[in-house]
A protein has these predicted regions:
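Pre-recognition alpha-helix immediately N-terminal to the DNA-recognition helix
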Residues: 26-31
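Basic amphipathic alpha-helical segments that dock to polyanions
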Residues: 60-70
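Short, Lys/Arg-enriched N-terminal segment that forms or immediately precedes the first helix
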Residues: 4-18
Length: 141
């Protein structure tokens, strides 16, 4: 059953950004929510293909990147790894397992403003702050 409040948020964000509300964008957002984890575009494509025959990987990337820009999903860029898309758009942090590559959510209050301020003092233009802890997950320890 589609999450109508999630659909409403996406619809409002698309319209506010001057974008069309399409069935494809709604389905891809729903699929990301249903996967409930940090998914690659390839995983989203695989899960969405039965509902959207003929869907292509470039289209999935473009749509997921748009969702991230609109603030209804998050894009997580890893060093040398495929981007992951997070259905949780609200601020939170991540833990990346260095053994299996799994990415987990970490709910903690961190003063990201202080991190951004320190970077700006160093002459850096900060667009956002993402904190990722690295180590071994419980399954790999």
């Amino acid at each position: 059953m589609p999450d109508t409040s999630s659909d409403a948020r996406l619809t409002a964000a698309l319209r506010a950004g001057g974008h069309r509300v399409t069935a494809q964008r709604l389905v891809l957002h729903r699929v990301l929510q249903e996967l409930g984890t940090h998914a690659t575009a390839e995983e989203v494509l695989q899960a969405a293909s039965p509902r959207l025959p003929g869907l292509s990987l470039p289209t999935v990337y473009a749509s997921l990147d748009l969702l991230a820009r609109l603030g209804v999903a998050r894009r997580i860029d890893g060093a040398g790894a495929a981007a992951l898309y997070d259905p949780r758009a609200e601020p939170h942090h991540h833990f990346a397992c260095r053994s299996c590559g799994r990415v987990l959510d970490v709910d903690a209050e961190i003063d990201t403003g202080a991190l951004a301020s320190a970077a700006r003092r160093g002459g850096l233009a900060v667009d956002g702050v993402d904190v990722t802890l690295r180590g071994l997950c419980p399954d790999c320890r």
